[in-house]
Amino acid sequence: MARLQAAAVVEAIPRDWFEEYVRALLDRAEDLRTDEEGRIQGDEELADVALVEGDHLTAGARYQRHTDPPEGEDGNGTTSELLITSWERTREVSAAVTTWHPDDQKTTWTVKLSDPGAPGSLVAGGEHHAAKRLHRLSWAARLDIRQWWRQVEGGGGQAPVTVLLRHHYGQARLLVRAAAEGGGKWRLGLTLVVRGRGWVRPLAAVGLLFVRSKLEAELREAVAEIAENWNADIPELLKHDPRDAGIWVSDLRRDREELDRWLAENG
């Protein structure tokens, strides 16, 4: 087992701005409409998404999107399906996403936002399914939003962010703690615990002794790069009204598809 540490100071997001931003994101989704064939109307980047089952933005609503690769025969692309499992603005919004890739690979995601009006927590998880065990992955992440605000307002307690990545031969667990830094900034403390699993565990324990310093240096470099990008983007974002700013549904979908594609290409 190796325990790696990193830290960063990042621009803070005001709580009221964030909560209004989330409400605006959900409002925008609800403003979208479907035509007679189920195609999404109101956002050109979602024009290739169709409602194939159920009523728009209600539990059981099922949406699909089909793509073909830049080269290759038609029908050799991916199919993505989003299933709304809950849409109750006063309690919970949740969905499940499945993407079928060529070569019999599949990526599944679940996401759940509790108390959307004043967000309480965001939980996400998923799996990448592949024929070879070596290429299978699963992950789970939780952001306890209320605990985050408590920590940046001077409280203690458990880490508000936890991420678990699991492979047949190893796993990594990330914990993120937050504190107010002053001057409109947050100080983040990150702990990454890496270990082997199964018969690999004793071998990994020995190997990690030799590469721990290198892994920690790479972690700190990655965290510094992410913090630098965050600190460049967030001040610009905060100049806007939260109902006009931001990352909307199409941007979130594009980010998830890029990650799914990376998993498939490396699976």
Q: Residues of each region from the PLM?
A:
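Beta-strand/loop substructures that line and gate deep hydrophobic ligand-binding cavities in soluble
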Residues: 97-216
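Actinobacteria-biased recognition of intrinsically disordered, low-complexity terminal regions
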Residues: 1-7, 252-267
